[in-house]
Amino acid sequence: MTVAQEEIFGPVLSIIGYEDEDDAVRIANDSLYGLSGGVWSADQDRAIAVARRMRTGAVDVNGGSFNIAAPFGGYKQSGYGRENGPYGIDEFLQTKSLQL
């Protein structure tokens, strides 16, 4: 389904039917992009298990709020690195190895 494969910016809600959790994860991951996603469930542990399987840089579980201290950035063709938190600082560092 096209809407699930494009990176859309804006207030968009897509409702897509799925057979089971494996199918839902397959649909969520079937994209060239992976900036963020969301999982809603009455069972928080189950929602977290699904969120861990999603190939996105951020996943809100049950509408979790944005955390400015958490690293932010996408997977695959989304974004250009990480912002915020220690991973955001790493974007400005270069590693050097010296052998004597």
Give the label of every model feature segment.
Residues 1-100:
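Conserved C-terminal structural/oligomerization subdomain of aldehyde/semialdehyde dehydrogenase
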